[in-house]
């Protein structure tokens, strides 16, 4: 069995809040959202809410930890059920699973302001709020307005995207009527079609939006900004065979050095190494790396993927 030896690196995780009253269709929307990206995502279930994803979408891959239980979704997303304190749960996920995005689905009666306050206490350069999303049930809107208007007003105050669910057959005019009833301000995105018909740019903006939580007097405010996609450079791949490394400390140093961008913008490193009849596998993704024991020997080689690779320097590093 492979066993972790070293895990180092920074964490950068964006939190996407998806709220809505009981039965609004949050889980169905989350499933569609996850299917629209290849990014690494964790969905959190804890005392603020119950995820209740249908069993057919879950694999029972419990990791047997007492405080945090993990299931893997069929499309590679991870669902967490935890009995830790809410903020502790977020920090634990950031430092153990380290996803690009954490989707939090609170219960249908959770106070969103309280959740955002807690997120603010742990927001820093490596954890930030993403786009808050409100799911509005078109079939149950009158009931919510008549009986739970305070709850709905709280949610409308802290969102950047309003999604009308159960609206597959609605006309654009009917969407506009709901927008007017809710008095959605111009700062919130309000698509006039069901999300199954959205163009890719709406889905991309969900992942590209960053939020800053601010205190204005006694009130909280969220300032949102869409980060435009940069022009992507074509990734290059470089393979080095028969690498010459005889100490794990040296390998650890090399992987840290590769993150410095002195030998290129390196996105991924994967390799195998044998030292004193012990076999190891090493991986680097972004600013995180891991060295683990390997049951089998696969030689001494490394594959480096990135842009602007300084191949001569890379070869020197792994061959001396």
Predicted regions mapped to residue ranges:
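Short, Lys/Arg-enriched N-terminal segments with co-localized hydrophobic residues
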Residues: 1-12
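Nucleotide-state-sensitive switch-loop elements of NTP-binding domains
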Residues: 14-19, 24-145
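Flexible loop/N-cap segments at domain edges
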Residues: 304
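C-terminal accessory "lid"/substrate-recognition subdomains
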Residues: 158-164, 169-297, 309-311, 319-320
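Conserved C-terminal guanine-recognition region of P-loop GTPase G domains, centered on the G4
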Residues: 110-111, 115-130, 134-190
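Short, hinge-like loop/turn segments at secondary-structure boundaries
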Residues: 59-62, 121, 150-152, 180, ...
